[in-house]
């Protein structure tokens, strides 16, 4: 149990630092759409899709790696709470179209990236 807790802790810290770096780099590029948050969510969705596909095929993987990557890293990297706050800020500023676009791109983009990663991994390992 302690190993699993440490894996979540290490993965979460690493994912959070990655999210912060992406936000610092990409959020200033567009004043209405926080591109760093979007990038973090899309990358996280892709990684978790790839992880779930990999773990479903490689059943001998230590559970520590599973929680480090999915619960830890992807949990720290993806930013639903930040995303939600940013949408609320856009709404408060009266930028309803941008808020709706932000919701649309983050949610559908994340679903698409998860499905793409799962499909790519499954296709590459099919015999």
UniProtKB/Swiss-Prot annotation:
It is found in: Cell inner membrane. The gene is fluC. GO terms for biological process: cellular detoxification of fluoride. InterPro entries: FluC. It is a multi-pass membrane protein. Belongs to the fluoride channel Fluc/FEX (TC 1.A.43) family. Na(+) binds at residues 75, 78. Keywords: Cell inner membrane, Cell membrane, Ion channel, Ion transport, Membrane, Metal-binding, Sodium, Transmembrane, Transmembrane helix, Transport. It comes from the Bacteria. GO terms for cellular component: plasma membrane. This is Fluoride-specific ion channel FluC. Na(+) is not transported, but it plays an essential structural role and its presence is essential for fluoride channel function. It holds the Pfam family CRCB. PANTHER family: FLUORIDE EXPORT PROTEIN 1-RELATED. It catalyses: fluoride(in) = fluoride(out). The chain crosses the membrane at residues 4-24, 35-55, 71-91, 103-123.
């Amino acid at each position: 149990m302690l190993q699993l807790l440490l894996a979540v802790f290490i993965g979460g810290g690493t994912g959070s630092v990655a999210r912060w770096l992406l936000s610092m780099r990409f959020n200033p590029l567009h004043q209405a759409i926080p591109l760093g948050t979007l990038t973090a969510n899309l990358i996280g969705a892709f990684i978790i899709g790839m992880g779930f596909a990999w773990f479903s095929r490689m059943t001998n993987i230590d559970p520590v790696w599973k929680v480090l990557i999915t619960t830890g890293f992807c949990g720290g990297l993806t930013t639903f709470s930040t995303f939600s706050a940013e949408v609320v800020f856009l709404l408060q500023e009266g930028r309803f179209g941008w808020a709706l676009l932000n919701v649309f791109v983050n949610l559908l983009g994340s679903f698409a990236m998860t499905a793409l990663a799962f499909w790519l991994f499954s296709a590459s390992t099919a015999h």
